[in-house]
Amino acid sequence: MGVTTVAITNMEYTSGVTSRHKSRKKLHEVCDIVIDNCGDFEDSSMLLPGMKQKIGPTSSAVGCTIVNMIVIRTVEHLMEKGIEPPIFHSANVDGGEEFNNVLFEKYKDQIHYM
């Protein structure tokens, strides 16, 4: 029994470089699901005057957006099946901490790092 692996990667970048892994394989070649973050080569967005290399990676913001969209769609699918997933509330809003404490109490045996 295995797990399904998902990669968020920059396909333009990976197409322009050789693998540094001893297997000579790249991430997208060993994962079941591959999501292209559509970044530029070298994952950089700006070339400032006097610089030899570009700076300002886009993969961080795009990757976070992709992951958050996956979470949103997953919650939508669960709700459509009548399942209300335990989602933490922002602790910075009134009542947020109390709301989260209920979840902590309910799932305390499964949340070992808290």
Regions found by a protein language model. Name each.
Residues M1-T65, V71:
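Glycine-rich phosphate-binding loops that contact phosphosugars or nucleotide phosphates
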Residues D32-I33, V62-M69, V102-M114:
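Short, Lys/Arg-enriched charge-dense amphipathic segments
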Residues E76-M114:
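Active-site phosphate/pyrophosphate-binding segments
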